[in-house]
C-alpha cells in the first residue's frame, strides 16, 4: 500500500469519525431538547396547578366571606324585625296601661270590678281567712263590697263565709303621677292582692298584673296581627 492509499484510508476514517461524532452530537442535542421540553412542560403544568389551587383557595375564601356577610346581614335584619315587633307591642301595652288608669274613674263600674276581683281571688285561694291589700284611695270602695263579695264566694264555693282583713299598714302603690311621666316609682292602676294569713299563698289581682298576664298569653297573636307572620314562618 503506497502513501496515497494510506492517506485516502485515513481521510475516510476521519470522515467516518467526524460523521459519527456529528450524529452523536445531534442525538445528544435532540435528547437534551426533548428533556428540556419535558422539564419545561412539567414546570408549566406545576405552575398551572399552583395557579388553579390558589384560584380555588381564593374562590373558597370569597364564598366563605359572602356567606358570613349574608349571615351577618340576615341576623341584623332579624334583630331589626324583632326590635320593631317589640316597639309596637311595647307601645300597645303602654297605651293599654294608660287606659287602665281611667278604669277607676268610673266609680260604679270600678266598684263592680273590685268585687269581682275579690271573689275571683277568694276562689283561687280557697282559704278561710285572708289578708287583702288595696290602694289607700280604694279602701272605702273595698269596704263597701267586701260583705257582698264574701257572700257570693261562699255560695259559689259552697263553704262558710271567709274572714277578710284589710291590711291598713301596707297599701298598694298609688297610680302614676301624670306630672312625672318618666318616673320609675312603683305604681298601681287598681285592683287587689289577697294572701293567706301566713303569706305563703298570694293572688295578685291588680289591673296591672292582669294586663301583664294577658299580654304574655296573647303575645304570639298580638305580634302576628300587628306586625305580620312570625319570623320562623318566613324562613
UniProtKB/Swiss-Prot annotation:
Task of the protein: Subunit of the peripheral V1 complex of vacuolar ATPase essential for assembly or catalytic function. V-ATPase is responsible for acidifying a variety of intracellular compartments in eukaryotic cells.
Quaternary structure and partners: V-ATPase is a heteromultimeric enzyme composed of a peripheral catalytic V1 complex (components A to H) attached to an integral membrane V0 proton pore complex (components: a, c, c'', d and e).
Family of the protein in this entry: Belongs to the V-ATPase E subunit family.
Topology class, membrane: Peripheral membrane protein
Keyword ATP-binding carried by entry: no
Gene3D superfamilies given in the database record: 6.10.250.1620, ATP synthase, E subunit, C-terminal
Main location: membrane
Keyword check for Phosphoprotein: no
Source organism, top-level taxon: Eukaryota
Modified residues (N-acetylmethionine): 1
Matching SUPFAM superfamilies: V-type ATPase subunit E-like (SSF160527)
Gene Ontology cellular component annotations, sorted alphabetically: cytosol; proton-transporting two-sector ATPase complex, catalytic domain; vacuolar membrane; vacuole
Organism expressing this protein natively: Arabidopsis thaliana (Mouse-ear cress)
Localisation per UniProt entry: Vacuole membrane
Coiled coil: 8-64
InterPro entries, alphabetized: ATPase_E_C, ATPase_V1_Esu
Pfam families according to UniProt: vATP-synt_E
One function term, GO molecular function aspect: proton-transporting ATPase activity, rotational mechanism
Keywords: Acetylation, Coiled coil, Hydrogen ion transport, Ion transport, Membrane, Transport, Vacuole
Protein name as it appears in the record: V-type proton ATPase subunit E2
Amino acid at each position: 500500500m503506497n502513501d496515497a492509499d494510506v492517506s485516502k484510508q485515513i481521510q475516510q476514517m476521519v470522515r467516518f469519525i467526524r460523521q459519527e461524532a456529528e450524529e452523536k452530537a445531534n442525538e445528544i442535542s435532540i435528547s437534551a431538547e426533548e428533556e428540556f421540553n419535558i422539564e419545561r412542560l412539567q414546570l408549566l403544568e406545576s405552575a398551572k396547578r399552583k395557579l388553579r389551587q390558589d384560584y380555588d383557595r381564593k374562590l373558597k375564601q370569597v364564598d366563605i366571606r359572602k356567606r358570613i356577610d349574608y349571615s351577618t346581614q340576615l341576623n341584623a335584619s332579624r334583630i331589626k324585625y324583632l326590635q320593631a315587633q317589640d316597639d309596637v307591642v311595647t307601645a300597645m301595652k303602654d297605651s293599654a296601661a294608660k287606659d287602665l288608669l281611667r278604669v277607676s274613674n268610673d266609680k260604679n263600674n270600678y266598684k263592680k270590678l273590685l268585687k269581682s276581683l275579690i271573689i275571683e281571688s277568694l276562689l283561687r285561694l280557697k282559704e278561710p281567712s285572708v289578708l287583702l291589700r288595696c290602694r289607700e284611695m280604694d279602701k272605702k270602695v273595698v269596704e263597701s263590697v267586701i260583705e257582698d263579695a264574701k257572700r257570693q264566694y261562699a255560695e259559689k264555693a259552697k263553704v262558710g263565709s271567709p274572714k277578710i282583713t284589710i291590711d291598713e299598714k301596707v297599701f298598694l302603690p298609688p297610680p302614676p303621677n301624670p306630672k312625672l311621666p318618666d318616673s320609675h316609682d312603683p305604681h298601681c292602676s287598681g285592683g287587689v292582692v289577697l294572701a293567706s294569713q301566713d303569706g305563703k299563698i298570694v293572688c295578685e289581682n291588680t289591673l296591672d298584673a292582669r294586663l301583664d298576664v294577658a299580654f304574655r298569653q296573647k303575645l304570639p297573636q298580638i305580634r302576628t296581627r300587628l306586625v305580620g307572620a312570625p319570623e320562623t314562618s318566613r324562613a
